[in-house]
Amino acid sequence: YRSNAQSRILEDSILRADLPYRIYGGVRFYERLEIKNALSYAKLAVDNQNDAAFERIINVPSRGIGAKTMDQIRELARENTLSLWGAAKKLSDNSGPKVSNALKEFFSVVDKISKMANNKEIEEFFEKLVDLSGLKEFHGKEPGEKGRSRVENLEELVSAAAGFFSIGEDADDERSQLSLIHI
């Protein structure tokens, strides 16, 4: 294939056929940084208790939430038996304006994405997700071919989302809403 984004179609076909495969000189589509980031936004939008997704995207794109703030969030979560989301919410209410504003911006982005999850077709959901999250702009700023390739991969993820319901059973409106799939 000529573009890394095109590998997704081939990989999906191989996976559906349940054939073992190995990629030489590259990374599997769903293992790529930008794809994992986008899927983590989707996971957190559907379940804000998902600590792995939270950790992956809390500062992607950069919001000024550093290691010190993450350590505070983890400690607060551990001490109060909270999810990282819950601990970050608590920290945002009890911290200085810089940390508080950065966390509130993050919550706002995830909340906007979450509200779309039940009201959009899955393709439209992912299209909006890559824009609202800032991932498309963030990766588009990477220099040269690397940035272009990452943006193409995000666009391919949107196309892949359109195909989630075109295979197998009849797709109806209820089934094509994100709230009914497991990411």
Regions found by a protein language model. Give the residues of each.
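Conserved helicase C-terminal RecA-like lobe
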Residues: 4-19, 23, 32, 39-181
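Conserved RecA-like helicase motor core of SF1/SF2 enzymes
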Residues: 27-28
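Flexible glycine-/small-residue-rich
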Residues: 1
